[in-house]
């Protein structure tokens, strides 16, 4: 298996999500993490970083969009680092979050348990419950720039 090349474009299908909400594609046996990707999408992916056991990439063109892709309603989505699932329909967001827990229990915990379906919010908007406060080397504290 040849290593993937930084800057080169490969065609792949997104087959799942990482624990951080990145799409996961497999190209010639290599795992590629792709932000703003949706499970089931067939896309051209440019390799942006080659690491020891995986690669990072970005979508160049979507050949077959997922029916679970939606246009984010937030103008900062994809730039501020706070809404990893904003481009997903709410049912797909819940499936992705359920998969995250299932993967942690099975692959990391070694447990043979089945995670129940997530009971979603009645109103899937305006329920943000996470905030990141990065601390700089100089001691400054603040939000990521959008």
What are these regions (language model features)?
Residues 1-146:
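Non-catalytic accessory regions of SAM-dependent methyltransferases
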